[in-house]
Amino acid sequence: MAGSEELGLREDTLRVLAAFLRRGEAAGSPVPTPPRSPAQEEPTDFLSRLRRCLPCSLGRGAAPSESPRPCSLPIRPCYGLEPGPATPDFYALVAQRLEQLVQEQLKSPPSPELQGPPSTEKEAILRRLVALLEEEAEVINQKLASDPALRSKLVRLSSDSFARLVELFCSRDDSSRPSRACPGPPPPSPEPLARLALAMELSRRVAGLGGTLAGLSVEHVHSFTPWIQAHGGWEGILAVSPVDLNLPLD
């Protein structure tokens, strides 16, 4: 994937994620927000908050590289060849589709793998964190406020531990989920799309916790970039996995 094309897709993904976070707040389920000093106040704009989670070259004020001046200009019609930029309504529609997928996934309990005894103390802590993240934002806030040690473990996770946290959070017991006919053709690969939706849900649940956790969650969402690109970008994904208008989410 060309560098400029990848950066453009990552920017689109950030906008989808910002719209997804905005849906959660509008629905009355704000992300966890531990107390901060005035010097630690986060920007209220979701997109700005997400960019602060990324390395400078990918998020905070990265200056676009200057293109060399062309020697000639192509002769082509000025209409009908390339789509215009996506609108806020488009990102909101993608976020709505992802929200529907999240609701479908969360109807199923966590994987039976979580029922057995943990093999290590580290695994036990990660399972405890997953159980915490299954709660509503208000409950997460209350438990983290009463257990600073647990919050410290959560915001200081290593990348390897976070990868395991993602694996546990996204593992669902498919046997308990009723089958439901979806309108239109099925998505090109339902499992990656469902995992991507859950990755955004995890980002929503940890977005206000600070530390390295928010950045790791956003980078995990960006790890789906090759898959998104292979299926025609967000436009292609929405075209083959449309919003189910029979689910009144708004």
UniProtKB/Swiss-Prot annotation:
Superkingdom field: Eukaryota
Location of Omega-N-methylarginine modifications: R60
Annotated stretches, region: Disordered: 24-46
PANTHER family in UniProt: BCL-2-LIKE PROTEIN 12, SI:CH73-248E21.1
InterPro entries recorded: Bcl-2-like_sf
Modified residues (Phosphothreonine): T33
Residues of the signal peptide: none
Protein name: Bcl-2-like protein 12
Transmembrane segments annotated in the record for this chain: none
Post-translational modification Phosphoserine, affected residues: S29, S37, S111, S158, S159, S161, S189
GO cellular component: membrane; nucleus
Tissue occurrence: Expressed mainly in breast, thymus, prostate, fetal liver, colon, placenta, pancreas, small intestine, spinal cord, kidney, and bone marrow and to a lesser extent in many other tissues. Isoform 2 is primarily expressed in skeletal muscle.
Keywords: Apoptosis, Methylation, Phosphoprotein
Residue ranges annotated as motif BH2: 227-238
GO biological process: apoptotic process; negative regulation of apoptotic process; negative regulation of cellular senescence; negative regulation of intrinsic apoptotic signaling pathway in response to DNA damage by p53 class mediator; positive regulation of transcription by RNA polymerase II
Gene name, Swiss-Prot/TrEMBL: BCL2L12
Family: Belongs to the Bcl-2 family.
GO molecular function: p53 binding
